[in-house]
Amino acid sequence: MDLKDKKILVIGLARTGVALCRFLAERGARVTVTDMASPASLAEPRRQIAGLGITEELGIARPRWQGYDLIIPSPGVPPELVWLNRARESGIPVWGELELASHFIEKPLLAVSGTNGKTTTTTLVGELLKASGLRPLVGGNIGTPVISLLARQHQADFLVLEVSSFQLDTAPSLHPQAAALLNITPDHLDRYPSLAAYAASKAGLFRHMRENELKVLNAGDKLVATLGGGPGRVSFFSSNRPLTRGAWLADESIHLKLDDAKEELFPVADIRLSGCHNLENVMAALTLALDAGAVPEACRRVLASFQGLPHRLEFVAEVDRVAFYDDSKGTNVGAVAVSLAYFSKPVILIAGGRDKDSDFSLISPLIRERVKALVLLGETQERLSQVWKGLAPICQVKDLAEAVRRAHDLARPGEVVLLSPACASFDMFKDYVHRGETFQRLVKELQHAN
């Protein structure tokens, strides 16, 4: 794809926007970048693109869009902006960063999507391949923009990408040679009109599959299990019933059989990650990695040491014999359900944040069964209080510091305090990482005070 002298508008000057500006300018495009934030607040990203000949239009809510050959919004830009729709209607292509990258990807692409577990699975695939002597580049929605990986792809054997539904919506040319869809539970319904529409977005992962390429699907997820039609080899994984091929859990081991290869066993006792949800992530990662040439014995070594990622059901500390867990990444009801099911002890649940039009009643039975008390905060606390009224005692608080103190007061020795918000973080925090780090700091302060 020739970008020389193309007039391209980049929307947003955060990490992806900076990467886009550099990539496009290096290929001779005439780049303009726009951002609603003031020039003063964008000093660092502006420094990173200085000297590239990029036109800046900053502090503008509605930039001039006419006359461009291509418009590329950063991932956080709402796709339904009126002026963006007008640009589309006028015939100007509006691409996501991943769509641009897909025109320059030269190496085999392994992709992972799903409502929950994407980052853990994507990271694990990369580790399994590396341990087997292969050279993966890992990125995408996981943190490193794909466009930033392309300069190093000549040193790699594979690109391994985490792909969100938002990215799939704006990357119609994306063509992975192998892809895993982990699960589909209600999420982002503030953006999609229905769960079916959200599932259709996820199914875009497989739109360009060819006969010899691999689809890895969760047999235990009713929506995901229906998406195996069309070209491509299908390999299912299941945590609740044995299969004749694919990956399944039985007799305290993960069994994995790909095509005509011999069946491999991975004992659960030798896998450091815990919880049924993580065993499903492991099955998907093993399927992708072994199909790509990973060595089973090397994979066993990785599974014995891989401890997961921060803010995903992460043990923080014990205070007065009460265990505190950080599940700040639990931004939807499906993730909270998985986390609550993990514990056999009574849970004091800290929840709330920015709503994504979730149906919180879906986890009401689990709240009644597993939760001793609810500590609610953020924009959704009133709604959550109404939906979960009568299921457990409710305490509403003004901030996370008060939530940690009140949860500690409510808990008894041997019980669990779990931050699993079921909501986005943007009402009070920069992102889920900021929320999780704040929670961990508050717990450590509580621990030292006691």
Regions found by a protein language model. Give the residues of each.
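Short internal beta-strands
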Residues: 30-37, 215-219, 350-351, 370-379
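Short beta-strand "acidic-cap" motif of Rossmann-like dinucleotide-binding folds
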Residues: 31-35, 137-138, 160, 236, ...
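Nucleotide phosphate-binding/pyrophosphate-handling subdomain across enzymes
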Residues: 2-7, 17-27, 135, 266-371
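C-terminal helical cap/extension that packs against the catalytic core
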Residues: 44-47, 54, 361-415, 450
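Residue-level signal for inorganic ion chemistry
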Residues: 24, 71, 112, 141, ...
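Phosphate-binding loop of NTP-binding sites
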Residues: 25-26, 47, 64-66, 75-219, ...
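Beta-strand->loop->alpha-helix junctions that form or flank phosphate-binding loops
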Residues: 32-36, 57-60, 95-99, 231-249, ...
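N-terminal leader/targeting and accessory segments in enzymes
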Residues: 1-96, 100, 449
